[in-house]
């Protein structure tokens, strides 16, 4: 019979500790929503915000397609403005890009794209949520996204392309979908508070 040495005990303890850590990690992963679930959660949060806004503004119908387009183009303009230090060659004294402000402007574009999806599309959003490549590796500037957005339409392929374009803008500036999701939740709370006040 093999003798149990101090080394055996130490190795066993190490393995036991590692196994415990792995079990903890697996449990954490099991409780973590998938990206598709996060996307559906964003749609739900946006739907609730839209209802608040529509009640407050006494709107009987959602905004028109053109109104959505104007709002999204305006938010892309604000996102691009946050990047002025990168493209404003005629002015020497530009503030450096503020990553937090940039993220908030990107989230604002997400708000209107989600709202459009809730109010102006006629397909299964679960299917859309499961079709989006959240680990999309392409990178897009706001202008490149705008070019994609010009094909913005009711169909699922176009909406999939729109959201993957937004993920691509996030990639360009170092924002993962997870980070966008967390920032979206925070901004959504602010938007709900505004909708309940006199904003």
What are these model-derived regions, one by one?
Residues 3-199:
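Flexible "arm" and connector segments at domain edges
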């Amino acid at each position: 019979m093999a003798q149990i040495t101090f080394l055996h005990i130490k190795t066993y303890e190490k393995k036991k500790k590692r196994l415990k850590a792995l079990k903890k990690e697996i449990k954490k992963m099991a409780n973590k929503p998938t990206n598709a679930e996060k996307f559906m959660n964003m749609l739900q949060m946006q739907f609730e915000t839209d209802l608040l806004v529509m009640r407050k503004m006494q709107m009987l119908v959602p905004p028109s397609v053109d109104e959505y387009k104007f709002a999204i183009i305006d938010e892309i303009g604000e996102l691009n403005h946050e990047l002025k230090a990168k493209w404003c060659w005629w002015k020497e004294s530009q503030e450096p890009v503020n990553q937090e402000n940039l993220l908030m402007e990107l989230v604002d574009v997400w708000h209107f794209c989600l709202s459009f999806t809730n109010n102006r599309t006629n397909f299964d959003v679960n299917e859309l949520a499961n079709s989006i490549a959240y680990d999309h590796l392409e990178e897009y500037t706001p202008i490149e996204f705008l070019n994609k957005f010009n094909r913005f339409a009711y169909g699922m392929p176009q909406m999939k392309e729109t959201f993957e374009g937004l993920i691509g803008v996030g990639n360009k500036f170092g924002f993962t979908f997870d980070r966008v999701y967390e920032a979206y939740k925070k901004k959504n709370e602010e938007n709900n508070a505004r909708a309940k006040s006199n904003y």
